[in-house]
């Protein structure tokens, strides 16, 4: 997790396309690159 709330919002308040892994704005309904509707928020916790 980031040290500052502003940095955390900038880094993690993003949606990721499940099909092409493109970054999208948090208000997006579909992917900006491929048009896919399956979007998830970027993971806030590290894996592993």
From Swiss-Prot:
InterPro entries: Ribosomal_eL40_arc, Ribosomal_eL40_dom, Ribosomal_eL40_sf, Ribosomal_zn-bd, Zinc_ribbon_dom. Keywords: Ribonucleoprotein, Ribosomal protein. GO terms for biological process: translation. GO terms for cellular component: ribonucleoprotein complex; ribosome. GO terms for molecular function: structural constituent of ribosome. The keyword Ribosomal protein applies. The keyword DNA-binding does not apply. It comes from the Archaea. Belongs to the eukaryotic ribosomal protein eL40 family. This is Large ribosomal subunit protein eL40. It comes from Methanothermobacter thermautotrophicus (strain ATCC 29096 / DSM 1053 / JCM 10044 / NBRC 100330 / Delta H).
């Amino acid at each position: 997790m980031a040290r500052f709330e502003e940095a955390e919002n900038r880094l993690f308040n993003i949606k990721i396309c499940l099909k092409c892994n493109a970054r999208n704005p948090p208000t997006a309904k579909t992917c900006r690159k491929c048009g896919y509707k399956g979007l998830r928020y970027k993971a806030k916790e590290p894996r592993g």
